[in-house]
């Protein structure tokens, strides 16, 4: 991606990329993507270089966050339901949204904008035809231009596309002209930049999703809190702890201590310098006059299992206070790691914090859907209502398992709540019946504590 051209063009428009924010986002992204950082490069006592293992705890933590904000249904109302379902499927929204959830947890911010592909631009600045598409943007390709009460009303987005094997960098700038949006698209290819300006309407053509946790890092206005960046010391020490543990296991074979005088000689009886391989296999004790102890002897190291277990558990406990939702989220007990998605099923108090993030996700999806409907009405001649409520349903399977759900139905049925409908619902879930069968069972059979099959 030609970031220099993007930077130069934005500067010509009076916009400056926030280098401080981008450096933090990039560092968080490196840990999320399991890139080898400078902190992973080490030297042993013999000055042999080695690298700490990259355990991917940052990726795991971000994925765990994403699990709790998965969406299973978007309902924009009866009239637009089929259109939105097909549109989201064509734009791979489910897969891209999942990817964005992880990136948001790691880097703090993701975005999406609506555009027309292969459209025709008329002299009056309006466009006709084309396909409505979604463009998904990472934090490294996002610049908030105008922020009002933490609401981003104007922004720039950039990224790389490939057309017929050729890479192009696309910059899109959304600004307001009165109450209506103006979109400027700049394509940087092999030749001169190609710029196109079109006039849109009052509906915001983009949406930004940020970490719901307050961003306490000064100088990152408009960007969400990058949770991975805030926890880099913990992720590093987890890598270091596992690296030392793996080293213990690797070196649990016998170590041979050998005197420098026990070396190979060449044909002229000159000592051959020690190879790197020999330095890995032996520990040399110098060339001093050897005794029986220093000439050569072996030792069998122990694997410090209990010490590593306690260290890793402590690090995960600290991580629990800083990452995820609620309070205690991770533990390492009896050789097993309990993750946040497992823990949330036991602690409903975590829902309070989780719902804040779900509200952010709900607003993000709401903004995308309304923009898509406006584009469809304006450029495709449809007449979908833009003011209807858009319902977003999240996947709660991590929070309430099937057994708990059935028990709730059972208790409601026994108490008479909901009458025949609740009884049928319980039987349908319990015995995997269809609606008609469940209704007949509920009507024909008695429903008491001894006959409910539980």
Locations of regions flagged by a protein language model:
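Short, basic interhelical loop/turn and adjoining N-cap
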Residues: 431-438
């Amino acid at each position: 991606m030609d970031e220099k051209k993007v930077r130069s063009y934005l500067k010509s428009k009076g916009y400056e990329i926030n280098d401080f924010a981008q450096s933090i986002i990039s560092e968080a992204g490196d840990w999320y993507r399991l890139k080898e950082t400078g902190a992973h490069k080490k030297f042993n006592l013999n000055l042999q270089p080695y690298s700490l293992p990259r355990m991917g705890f940052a990726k795991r933590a971000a994925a765990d966050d994403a699990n709790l904000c998965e969406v299973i249904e978007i309902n924009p109302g009866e009239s637009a339901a089929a259109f939105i379902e097909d549109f989201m499927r064509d734009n791979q929204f489910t897969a891209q949204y999942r990817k964005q959830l992880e990136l948001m947890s790691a880097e703090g911010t993701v975005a999406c904008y609506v555009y027309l592909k292969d459209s025709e631009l008329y002299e009056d600045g309006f466009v006709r035809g084309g396909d409505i598409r979604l463009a998904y943007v990472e934090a490294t390709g996002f610049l908030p231009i105008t922020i009002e009460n933490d609401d981003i009303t104007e922004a720039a987005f950039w990224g790389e596309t490939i057309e017929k094997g050729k890479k192009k960098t696309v910059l899109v700038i959304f600004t307001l002209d009165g109450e209506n949006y103006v979109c400027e698209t700049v394509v940087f290819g092999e030749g001169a930049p190609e710029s196109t300006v079109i006039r849109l309407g009052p509906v915001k053509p983009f949406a930004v999703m940020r970490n719901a946790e307050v961003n306490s890092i000064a100088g990152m206005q408009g960007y969400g809190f990058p949770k991975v960046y805030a926890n880099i010391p913990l992720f590093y020490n987890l890598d270091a702890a596992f690296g030392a543990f793996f080293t213990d296991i690797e070196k649990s074979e016998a170590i041979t201590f050998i005197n420098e005088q026990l070396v190979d000689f060449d044909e002229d009886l000159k000592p051959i310098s020690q190879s790197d391989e020999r330095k890995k296999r032996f520990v040399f004790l110098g060339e001093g006059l050897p005794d029986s102890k220093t000439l050569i002897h072996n030792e069998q190291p122990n694997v410090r299992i209990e010490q590593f277990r306690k260290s890793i558990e402590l690090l995960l406990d600290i991580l629990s206070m800083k990452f995820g939702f609620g309070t205690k989220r991770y533990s390492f007990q009896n050789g097993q790691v309990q993750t946040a998605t497992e823990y949330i099923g036991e602690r409903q108090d975590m829902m309070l914090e989780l719902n804040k993030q779900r509200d952010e996700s709900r607003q993000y999806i709401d903004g995308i859907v309304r923009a898509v409907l406006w584009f469809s009405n304006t450029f495709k001649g449809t007449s979908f209502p833009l003011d209807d409520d858009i319902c977003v349903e999240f996947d709660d399977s991590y929070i309430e398992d099937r057994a708990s759900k059935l028990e709730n139905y059972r208790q409601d049925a026994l108490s008479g709540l909901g009458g025949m409908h609740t009884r049928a619902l319980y039987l349908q879930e319990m015995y995997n019946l269809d609606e008609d069968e469940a209704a007949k069972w509920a009507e024909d059979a008695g429903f008491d504590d001894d006959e409910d099959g539980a």
